[in-house]
């Protein structure tokens, strides 16, 4: 059961990109053919918020067809009795190529293809009996998505990705106020 939870949490981390994301866009006063020029998009992943994982993303357009998306996640929840721990420090970058006619759309709206890489450290203990701690995890893959403007400074993004995740972890159990190492292993996931 604990291994299933561990796999589920890692799967959730990898595929939370399938969420709708609220995007706040700063746009310049200049417009070309009724489109505004996006200078910077500040974003938040709503699925991470539902999982109590504070996060922020910044997307920077690079020319008409390209953009760079940088994200950071940092849930750091634990109790003092060694009964619960939900800690993740993660960052990643994604290069995006925007498809379609860029003359009739904003620079960060419509369909896109992307390639991402991310990494971080984690410690998950959902039950007192066992937990999993990793000094690192690394993931990389490709994405497809669509951004739909809702208002002048608001849009929603949907994306789906497939990739590879690699991590070395230590399984532990809590004994009083101490954590006792039980075993260690490697985990590889494609999905």
Segments from the language model and where they lie:
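Cleavable N-terminal export/targeting peptides
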Residues: 1-35
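Short glycine/proline- and aromatic-enriched beta-strand/turn motifs that initiate or cap beta-hairpins
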Residues: 24-77, 82-90
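Short loop/turn motifs that connect adjacent beta-strands in outer-membrane beta-barrel proteins
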Residues: 27-38, 65, 100-110, 150-156
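Residues that define the transmembrane beta-barrel architecture of outer-membrane proteins
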Residues: 36-40, 50-52, 85-91, 109, ...
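Transmembrane beta-strands of outer-membrane beta-barrel proteins
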Residues: 40-44, 68-70, 109-117, 138-140, ...
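Transmembrane beta-strands of outer-membrane beta-barrel pores
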Residues: 46-50, 72-78, 92, 97-99, ...
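Residues on the lipid-exposed face of transmembrane beta-strands in outer-membrane beta-barrel proteins
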Residues: 56-60, 70, 93-97, 140-148, ...
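Predominantly the C-terminal beta-signal and adjacent terminal strand-loop region
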Residues: 151-191
């Amino acid at each position: 059961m604990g291994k299933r939870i561990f796999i589920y949490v890692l799967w959730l981390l990898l595929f939370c990109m399938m969420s709708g994301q609220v995007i706040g866009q700063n746009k310049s006063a200049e417009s070309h053919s009724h489109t505004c020029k996006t200078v910077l998009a500040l974003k938040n992943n709503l699925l991470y918020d539902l999982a109590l994982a504070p996060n922020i993303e910044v997307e920077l357009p690079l020319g008409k067809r390209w953009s760079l998306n940088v994200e950071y996640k940092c849930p750091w929840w634990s109790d003092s009795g060694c009964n619960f721990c939900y800690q993740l420090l993660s960052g990643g970058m994604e290069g995006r190529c925007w498809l379609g006619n860029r003359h009739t759309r904003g620079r960060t709206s419509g369909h896109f293809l992307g390639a991402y890489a991310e990494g971080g450290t984690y410690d998950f203990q959902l039950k007192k009996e066992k937990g999993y701690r990793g000094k690192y995890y690394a993931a990389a893959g490709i994405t497809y998505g669509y951004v739909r403007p809702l208002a002048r400074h608001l849009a929603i993004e949907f994306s789906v990705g497939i990739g590879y995740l690699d991590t070395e972890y230590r399984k532990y159990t809590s004994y009083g106020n101490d954590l006792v190492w039980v075993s260690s292993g490697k985990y590889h996931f494609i999905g």
